């Protein structure tokens, strides 16, 4: 399935067909058109996800995911960083925006003890996530809602203790609007934690396409300064961030120990740290 890529107005439009980008002269689509296209795209991915395979086969989703060691390590590193930056405590009510079929949401609930709500723009993703939660006995523990990050009409003001979002806001047409919505749905004093791909990471700049990983539509990369400014412009306070991960999710299991060592060294080495893959940022909702 080809993934369409549309860059912003006044810039080159590219449509990725398989792995070959083709220049087109089609007009820049509206934000709503991009989001509709994104919803359809993720509906397709959801139907082929590990969660869907688990529901179809009856196999334990943990056993399906267990073979993907690099991805599970990548996810846990992100979740632990979010927990640390957010100052979250077990049993708090968190919302994950861009939850897909729930791989992070389930782990945040079962492994880290949060009461979770998952939100995603893809109706098929939400359908599968709900079915999986029921099959795991988590139907009363996790709520899933369809929603748009830029609007979050499915969530009430101040309804959650904190918000997390992983690998999502990079595809949102208006990330500042999304952060303002994040501020709205989190209680005063709570924290919003969102990750962004680092513009200066070689993986995104040079290596991703060399390893056959398709360019995603609407994908954008950010500097730490841009991220900090967006959080401030959204009205979030006490902004702090960290840079982490040099390990791609496609890393073979045999190489994972070496990449974990690279993470350990790289994240602590001045200069090298600036090229880590992920900028994770946290901002506090002002107290009432």
For the regions a language model picked out, list residue spans one by one:
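A short glycine-rich, Lys/Arg-flanked "PGG" loop and its adjoining helix->strand segment in the class I
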Residues: 176-188
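Conserved beta-strand signature within the Rossmann-like core of class I S-adenosyl-L-methionine
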Residues: 190-196
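Short, glycine-/aromatic-enriched active-site segment of Class I SAM-dependent methyltransferases
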Residues: 198-218
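A C-terminal cap/extension of S-adenosyl-L-methionine-dependent methyltransferases
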Residues: 193, 207-210, 229, 239-288
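Short alpha-helix
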Residues: 219-234
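A short acidic, Gly/Pro-enriched loop at the edge of an enzyme's catalytic core
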Residues: 150, 154-162
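Class I SAM-dependent methyltransferase SAM/SAH-binding core
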Residues: 103-151
